[in-house]
């Protein structure tokens, strides 16, 4: 199966927020509609700190990828972090995720992004095999700690 990947804009807000709500419910994340809107609206309006790509047909997307950007001394420039990736359950395991990440990687590389990272959570994450298959490698040099500033 082949899926188009298109950068989402403000006209995609309703569908993006709906897909995000499904992902957050599936992952049992505590985010509400107000939080999702606060996160997505700036990116859909073109904020350079991140982007959302819709997967599949524009009228009925199959999922989305949300990437945030950061500057990396180690990489020598801009890097992307996959904050969220979601695919409707009915279309999973058909190669669409692989195609999607390839298309997003090509677009980011063309835009000068040096590396694309994904926080995969626990070492026993069932998606680890997927990440390895699509070319991501474990980074044993990095552990992340966080100070919540707001």
Where are these regions (language model features)?
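Extreme N-terminal starter segment of soluble prokaryotic enzymes
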Residues: 2-3
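Residue-level recognition of the GNAT/N-acetyltransferase active site
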Residues: 70, 88, 121
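Conserved acetyl-CoA-binding loop-helix of GNAT-fold acetyltransferases
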Residues: 87, 93-106, 133
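Conserved GNAT acetyl-CoA-binding A-motif
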Residues: 109-120
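Conserved beta-strand-loop-alpha-helix junction that forms the acyl-donor binding cleft
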Residues: 92, 118-127, 146-149
